């Protein structure tokens, strides 16, 4: 309510939850709040548009329709990194996550101040996380919701979510 944001659930229902829509929200969530920079500090005041971790980018790539493997004319698996959609999605995601304050990779293996705790503390508008992370959000003061990773653009026919023990969704 504080930011007068578009409802992500409605964006999903309308097929308008895209990388551009997510980025618009991310920009609204970034604020120094008196800090000198967006360098992470557990006791800092800066807020971020989106805090994620390593597989969060994979979730965004898959959501944007990028495929790591596709089938050839004989229905055999082939590497798809040279596919135009993969390049387009990777390029757009790279530009989104390279903006200071709008995205921060807060990987547990590199930093003990894990992305889940930053989200729980209200230091980020959104995160890309595993469903299991929601168990740590139960007593949060802020409301949150769960939506699929965004589509590349509105012309993409459906939302894609991958499933593995480490699969991430947008929260």
Predicted regions and their residues:
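Periplasmic solute-binding protein
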Residues: 1-9, 51-74, 164-171
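Surface-exposed patches in mature extracellular/periplasmic domains of secreted proteins
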Residues: 7-15, 34-48, 105-109
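Short, solvent-exposed loop/beta-turn-alpha elements that line the ligand-binding surface or hinge
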Residues: 10-14, 40-43, 67-88, 153-160
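Glycine-centered hinge/linker elements that transmit conformational signals in sensory
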Residues: 19-28, 58-108
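Short helices/loops that flank or line small-molecule/ion binding pockets
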Residues: 23-28, 111-127
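Loop/turn elements at helix/coil->beta-strand transitions in domains of secreted/extracellular proteins
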Residues: 32-35, 43-48, 99-102, 121-125, ...
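Beta->alpha turn/N-cap motifs
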Residues: 53-56, 129-134
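Extracytoplasmic/periplasmic substrate-recognition and gating elements
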Residues: 101, 137-171
């Amino acid at each position: 309510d504080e930011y007068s944001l578009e409802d992500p659930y409605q964006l999903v229902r309308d097929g308008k939850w895209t990388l551009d829509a997510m980025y618009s929200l991310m920009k609204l969530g970034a604020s120094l709040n008196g800090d000198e920079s967006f360098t992470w500090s557990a006791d800092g005041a800066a807020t971020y548009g989106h805090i994620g971790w390593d597989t969060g980018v994979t979730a965004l790539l898959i959501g944007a329709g990028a495929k790591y493997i596709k089938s050839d004319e004989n229905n055999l698996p082939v590497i798809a990194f040279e596919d135009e959609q993969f390049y387009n999605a990777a390029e757009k995601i790279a530009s989104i996550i390279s903006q200071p304050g709008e995205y921060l990779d807060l990987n547990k293996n590199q930093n003990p101040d894990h992305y889940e705790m930053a989200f729980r503390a209200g230091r980020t508008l959104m995160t890309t996380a595993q469903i299991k992370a929601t168990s740590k959000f139960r007593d949060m003061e802020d409301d949150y919701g769960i939506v699929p990773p965004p589509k590349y653009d509105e012309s993409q026919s459906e939302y894609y979510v991958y499933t593995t023990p480490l699969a991430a969704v947008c929260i």
